[in-house]
């Protein structure tokens, strides 16, 4: 059975409230909050769809409830659904560090899900890796054409490197703290800095990327993203809004890099 059809922007306030009324009082209270992680995932998925980042059910997003009473709760969009139509009750809820699934959309009344059998996102182990290795507040996975094109232009490279572009300043400057054993933000990148993003090879199945993603995260403590060749990109940040900004800034730089490459302009300016 295909995923239930949730027409984008079609529901008025009354219709939305009517849908929520079939949920438990606890869930009704959760989903009425526009800043609830599940609602933010829906909002961002629509924005990302409009940017051609999550078309054809591709890509995904997850948010850790860093501002909630339990910051170990992670909300993850399901697999195989049209991201621009997603609804808050369709999220999987996972608790760290045991990675215990606390709630699935299959637990929701069938009036909302139309008996559709939801599957966890294949990105789940990769999202979890970003939370455990970087203490991220959110992780975004897109199938951006700019990300794919850059990995094709640099087919034999293991890194994407660019410098002397103003937009680099939107990204964090990170450093490994030997005393704490953690990656810490020490400021923002500067115009003269080199942005380095590791590139890993794609695999037939998304979850098989986990080991190489973890290795890249460990080997590149200054990175906030990992490119997957011929596939897309994973981007994370300390909050969902930081992750959004980093993703937008990186995609801008990737698009610019494609244009620079076509024009024969070096991506790294020598001092």
Swiss-Prot record:
Binding-site list for substrate? 123
HAMAP family xrefs? Salvage_MtnB_euk
The annotated active site, in chain numbering, is 166 (proton donor/acceptor)
Would you identify the family this protein belongs to, as annotated? Belongs to the aldolase class II family. MtnB subfamily.
Spell out the protein name for this chain. Answer: Methylthioribulose-1-phosphate dehydratase
Q: Where is Zn(2+) annotated to bind?
A: 141, 143, 231
Its Gene Ontology cellular component terms are: cytoplasm
Q: Which cofactor does it need?
A: Zn(2+)
Q: Which gene encodes it?
A: MDE1
Catalyses which reaction? 5-(methylsulfanyl)-D-ribulose 1-phosphate = 5-methylsulfanyl-2,3-dioxopentyl phosphate + H2O
Recorded metabolic or biological pathway in which this protein acts:
Amino-acid biosynthesis; L-methionine biosynthesis via salvage pathway; L-methionine from S-methyl-5-thio-alpha-D-ribose 1-phosphate: step 2/6
Co-factor remark: Binds 1 zinc ion per subunit.
Q: What does this protein do?
A: Catalyzes the dehydration of methylthioribulose-1-phosphate (MTRu-1-P) into 2,3-diketo-5-methylthiopentyl-1-phosphate (DK-MTP-1-P).
Q: Where in the cell is it found?
A: Cytoplasm
Name the enzyme group at the top EC level: lyase
Q: Which GO terms describe its molecular function?
A: methylthioribulose 1-phosphate dehydratase activity; zinc ion binding
Q: Where is it predominantly found?
A: cytoplasm
GO biological processes: L-methionine salvage from methylthioadenosine
UniProt keywords, alphabetically: Amino-acid biosynthesis, Cytoplasm, Lyase, Metal-binding, Methionine biosynthesis, Zinc
List the Pfam families: Aldolase_II
